Curated annotation (Swiss-Prot):
Native organism: Psychromonas ingrahamii (strain DSM 17664 / CCUG 51855 / 37)
HAMAP family membership: UPF0761
UniProt subcellular location: Cell inner membrane
NCBIfam families linked to this entry: PRK01637.1, yihY_not_rbn
Assigned keywords, A-Z: Cell inner membrane, Cell membrane, Membrane, Transmembrane, Transmembrane helix
Chain segments annotated as transmembrane: 43-63, 100-120, 139-159, 179-199, 209-229, 243-263
Entry protein name: UPF0761 membrane protein Ping_3482
Annotated Gene Ontology cellular component terms: plasma membrane
Family designation: Belongs to the UPF0761 family.
Membrane topology: Multi-pass membrane protein
Alphabetized InterPro entries for the sequence: UPF0761_bac, Virul_fac_BrkB
Organismal lineage: Bacteria, Pseudomonadati, Pseudomonadota, Gammaproteobacteria, Alteromonadales
Length: 292
C-alpha cells in the first residue's frame, strides 16, 4: 500500500516539475509576443489565405459540393459567436479578389506565404533550431503546404461525409453522428500534431507531438466554449464598438488561438528534454547510491 502511494506521489511530483519546466520555458521564450505577432499577420493574410484555399478547392470538381461545409468549419472556428457576420464580410472580400489582375493574385499568394513563413520561424525558435533551410527549400515546402493543405482538408471533409452516409445506410446513424461530432476535435488534434512534427527543422517524436497536439486541442475547444460564454453574457464589446465589435473580438480570439498553438509547441519541444533530464538524474542517483 505504501509502495503504491509512493509511486503515485512520485508521478504527481514529476508532473508538477514538468508543468513548472514548461511554464519557465514559455516565460523564457515570451510566447505572448510571437502570439501577438502571428495574430496581426493572420488578420492581414486571412482573406488572401482563404481566397487561395477556395481557389485550390475549385480546381478539383470532386470538392465542389464541400465548399459550404468547409466555409462553416472555418468560420465557426474562426470566431465562435460571430461566424455568420464574419462569413458575410470575408466572403464579400474574397469575391472582390476575383476581379484582381494576375499581379494582384500574386500578391495574395505572397501574403499567404508570409503567414506560413512566420509560423515556421516562430515554431523553430521554440525548438531552438540552429540549422536553417535554404530559401529555395523553404519556398518549396511553403508552396506545398499552401497547395496540398486545401486538398487534404477537402479529402477529410469528403471522408466525413462518406462515413456519415455509410452509417446512415446501415442504420447506425446515432453512432455515426456521435463519431462525426468528434471529427472536429480529432482533426484539430491531428493538425496540431502534424504541425509540431513537420515544421521544426529537426526530428520530432510523433508520440510527443500527439501529446502536445492533444493538450492544444483540449485548450482550444475549452477556450471556444469559455469565449462563447463570455461574449454571450458580457456583451460589453458590442455596446462600446457596435457593428465594429467583431474586429477587436476577432483579434482577441486569433491571439488566444495562436497562444494555444505555441503552448502545445512548448509542451512537445520540452517533453523529450525534460524526460532526458529525469533519466540523467536517475542514473546519477543510482551511480551515487552504488558508490556509497
Amino acid at each position: 500500500m505504501k509502495f503504491g502511494r509512493k509511486i503515485v506521489m512520485d508521478k504527481v511530483k514529476v508532473t508538477y516539475q514538468y508543468l513548472l519546466f514548461v511554464w519557465r520555458r514559455s516565460e523564457q521564450d515570451n510566447i505572448k509576443v510571437p502570439a501577438g505577432h502571428l495574430a496581426y499577420v493572420t488578420l492581414l493574410s486571412i482573406v488572401p489565405l482563404l481566397a487561395v484555399i477556395f481557389y485550390m478547392l475549385a480546381a478539383f470538381p470532386v470538392f465542389s459540393d464541400l465548399k459550404g461545409m468547409l466555409e462553416d468549419l472555418i468560420y465557426n472556428n474562426l470566431l465562435p459567436t460571430s461566424g455568420d457576420t464574419i462569413q458575410e464580410h470575408i466572403s464579400g472580400f474574397i469575391e472582390n479578389t476575383k476581379k484582381m489582375s494576375m499581379m494582384g493574385i500574386g500578391s495574395l499568394i505572397a501574403i499567404a506565404l508570409l503567414l506560413i513563413s512566420t509560423i515556421d520561424q516562430t515554431i523553430n525558435r521554440i525548438w531552438r533550431c540552429t540549422n536553417k533551410r535554404s530559401r529555395i527549400q523553404s519556398f518549396t515546402i511553403y508552396w506545398t503546404i499552401l497547395s496540398l493543405g486545401p486538398v487534404i482538408i477537402g479529402a477529410s471533409l469528403a471522408l466525413s461525409s462518406y462515413l456519415f452516409s455509410v452509417f446512415q445506410e446501415h442504420g447506425s446513424l446515432s453512432f455515426g453522428q456521435r463519431l462525426l461530432s468528434l471529427m472536429p476535435f480529432i482533426l484539430t488534434w491531428l493538425t496540431f500534431a502534424g504541425v509540431y512534427t513537420l515544421v521544426p527543422h529537426q526530428r520530432v517524436s510523433f508520440r510527443y507531438a500527439l501529446i502536445g497536439g492533444l493538450i492544444a486541442a483540449i485548450l482550444f475547444f475549452f477556450g471556444t466554449d469559455l469565449f462563447r460564454l463570455y461574449i454571450t453574457n458580457f456583451p460589453s464589446q458590442q455596446i462600446i464598438y457596435g457593428a465594429l465589435a467583431v474586429i477587436p473580438i476577432l483579434f482577441v480570439w486569433i491571439y488566444y488561438s495562436w497562444l494555444i498553438v505555441l503552448i502545445g509547441a512548448e509542451v512537445t519541444a520540452t517533453l523529450e528534454e525534460f524526460l532526458k533530464q529525469q533519466e540523467d538524474n536517475n542514473v546519477t542517483k543510482e551511480y551515487l547510491g552504488a558508490d556509497i
